[in-house]
């Protein structure tokens, strides 16, 4: 009978492989018995939206804050599903969720027919008051025209107010804002 001499390195690799197999099988069996406690849901559609100001003139009817929570991701401004401010200093858009939620991310659909770069640098802030000093969830980097992008908070944030704040002199336009919150599963 031949004996197999394993080197120390081979023994360590085999032990590590066994631990990995054991860990995976244990996690799979445990997760089968833990029910999902939460579901993710867009709670913005239940809220009330406001903004710092509104584009005036022939397009003011297309510029309302509530357009960003109408459930329509159409990114073409002239179809009437986007918001638009007047281009002043530090514009903001806010949704009052009417109650506090545990928020995990915010999804924004950018204007698609032009001007996609305008939103660059916007801050997404979430908190319990309607001011501009609430904690930051994320900062908007470069978004292309018409792009829909999800901005994840580094940890779930408790808040009633979600604000998109643009700290510069610029137009702020949003075609949809979804606030993704954790709700108890039924």
Curated annotation (Swiss-Prot):
GO terms for molecular function: calcium ion binding; carbohydrate binding; fucose binding. The keyword Ubl conjugation does not apply. Ca(2+) binds at residues 67, 70, 72, 81, 175-176. Its main location: secreted. One of its GO terms (cellular component) is extracellular space. Residues 40-186 are annotated as: F5/8 type C-like. Homotrimer. This is Fucolectin-6.
